[in-house]
Amino acid sequence: SKVLSLCESLKKGSVYYGGPAEKIENVKYFLAFSYMHCDISQKALGIFYEITSNYKLKAKDNLYFKAEAQIIDAKYWSFQEFKTLPAYINEFRKSWSIIEPKNPQLEARSFLTATNRMMVTYLALDKIRLANKWLQKNVRLAIKYESDEHLGYTYMDYAKGIYHLNLSLALKYLELADLHFQMPSEHRRHLDCQCEIQYVKFLLGTGSIEQLQLSQEALFENQYWIQYYKCHLKLSVCYILMGKREEALQHLLEAEAPTIMKNDERIKYLCCMIGTFLYSDPIPYENLALAGTSYHKIIRNTHLNFKQSNAVIYNAKETSPSYNLDPRVW
């Protein structure tokens, strides 16, 4: 993108720059932020760590917390650090609580991002009581900081984390979340949320494959590529449930092909789960960070039941001898 190219050029030329160092640090931040959205996450993380390491001998400010919040977000999406992440987030919260009273200009967005990641991390670990406490905390914090969009993020992210527990409740939270995504700045979230709504409706038997496909088309038309390709995985699951293996395989292949989907650990997990059923052959997937979670139970089920001819949506409250598909396809 133009922003990415511009930031890279500015960073390269920074050795000749004699102005305030803060400006160069901000350029680095925007470069790393651009890398995150172009699926170059390791490069991005290196820059975010570089930014935060510069604050060992100086007061922490907005840039520090913004970079730390991005590190927290990347750790969550790495799909490999759930067990250590709550302690890391608590360190962030301690630093914030010390600095905030002294710096009224501190932006709340990074703090709200960190507390949101606490909630979804506990959902990933199946620590539902703690997740519910953080749901309520995040609602209060979003109201306190007058951040309507973060109310939407809270409701949507909570909903996605309970697909394997209560699809009906998840749908209510998704529909509530979408009410907060009606402003132009939240258009991507609105279309993403609409896609999740149609997917959950299908799983509940109240929606249709056609409505989910229309939601995917809207993502395509707006060039929201990651969400668009992830919807192929949703469609693959839906076609499996309909008994249409050929269509399911076609959508799996569409999701696996793009470069942007190659280095994502969560995508790897989902593709292995779907592919094992469609190929009737266990595709190896190992992630020690998931031990003891519902994700791990689903992985074990795929290895035991890969020869099953039918599949069901995994529900943590029920046991099924059929092949279990994780509904958390996002």
List PLM regions with ranges.
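Short coil/turn connectors between adjacent alpha-helices in alpha-solenoid helical repeat scaffolds
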Residues: 1-2, 33-45, 74-89, 119-131, ...
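Amphipathic alpha-helical segments of tetratricopeptide repeats
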Residues: 8-16, 49-57, 90-103, 136-146, ...
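Short coil/turn linker motifs that delimit alpha-helical repeat modules in TPR/alpha-solenoid proteins
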Residues: 19-20, 59-62, 103-107, 127, ...
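Residue register of alpha-helical TPR repeats
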Residues: 26, 66-70, 106-113, 153, ...
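Structural register within alpha-helical repeat arrays
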Residues: 31, 71-75, 118, 151, ...
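Solenoidal tandem-repeat scaffolds enriched in leucines and small polar residues
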Residues: 93, 105-120, 124, 128-130, ...
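Eukaryotic tandem repeat interaction scaffolds
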Residues: 163, 167, 171-241, 250
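C-terminal non-catalytic interaction modules
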Residues: 224, 250-330
